[in-house]
């Protein structure tokens, strides 16, 4: 856990505060990267964590039933996003091409702040990105979204069973997943270990994010929820996990 020291997150805040980067002009911290107070000008937008969760799960139900609405894809809507963004939720998901976040939740342009990394692991860059979305874009819900058959979790399970190491940067991902496998019974089949490992890894990332001091304050104030979930490849359904 000591890898999650705040140095990189502090650097991100300095970057935002100083306006360093391509084309960034700031008047205050809430305007970083074209942000505004969340959901301004959108009276129907959900405000609470539970409202946002209901919105996402209703969208996923439409995806499962093949009744997609494809919201917020018009040229007029796109034009409203040229100066600011008001995402309603943050999704930390895997890079897997089979899990297209906006499609899975039937959301459109500007609706979701999406962070994708193989194995949905939490390193400095990911934790900083999540903090940015919560502290500056004011998203009231963070969902950690794993998926069935995750290749990164599969690699971690296979390494635990067979030994060996992968190339340096891939190994870094595996090393971050391996602690989550401690709760997974080695006597299970490989398939069942992967299935259990996916859930354990999602819960691990949820725990790490929930322990970040600034996010913990928001959770304590009941303005933020961090929710673990798994996407089922066969059905397309997002299944919420118990914390």
What are these model-derived regions, one by one?
Residues 26-65, 69-73:
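C-terminal segment of N-terminal export signals and the immediately downstream linker at the start
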Residues 70-110:
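N-terminal short beta-loop-beta anion/metal-coordinating cradle
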Residues 211-215, 222:
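Internal active-site segments that recognize and position negatively charged phosphoryl groups
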């Amino acid at each position: 856990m000591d890898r999650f020291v705040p140095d990189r997150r502090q650097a991100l805040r300095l970057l935002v505060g100083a306006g360093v980067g391509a084309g960034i002009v700031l008047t205050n911290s809430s305007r970083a990267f074209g942000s505004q107070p969340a959901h301004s000008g959108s009276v129907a937008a959900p405000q609470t964590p539970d409202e946002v969760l209901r919105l996402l799960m209703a969208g996923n139900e439409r995806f499962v039933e093949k009744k997609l609405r494809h919201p917020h894809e018009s040229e007029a809507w796109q034009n409203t996003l040229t100066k600011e963004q008001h995402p309603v939720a943050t999704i930390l998901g895997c890079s897997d091409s089979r899990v297209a976040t906006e499609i899975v939740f039937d959301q459109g342009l500007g609706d979701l702040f999406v962070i994708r990394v193989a194995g949905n692991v939490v390193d400095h860059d990911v934790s900083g990105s999540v903090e940015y979305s919560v502290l500056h874009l004011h998203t009231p819900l963070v969902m950690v979204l794993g998926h069935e058959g995750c290749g990164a979790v599969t690699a971690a399970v296979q390494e635990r069973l067979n030994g060996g190491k992968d190339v340096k940067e891939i190994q870094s991902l595996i090393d971050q997943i391996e602690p989550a496998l401690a709760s997974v019974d080695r006597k299970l089949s490989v398939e069942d270990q992967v299935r259990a490992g996916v859930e354990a890894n999602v819960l691990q990332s949820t725990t790490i994010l929930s322990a970040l001091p600034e996010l913990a304050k928001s959770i304590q104030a009941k303005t933020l929820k961090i929710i673990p979930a798994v996407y089922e490849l066969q059905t397309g359904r997002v299944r919420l996990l118990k914390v």
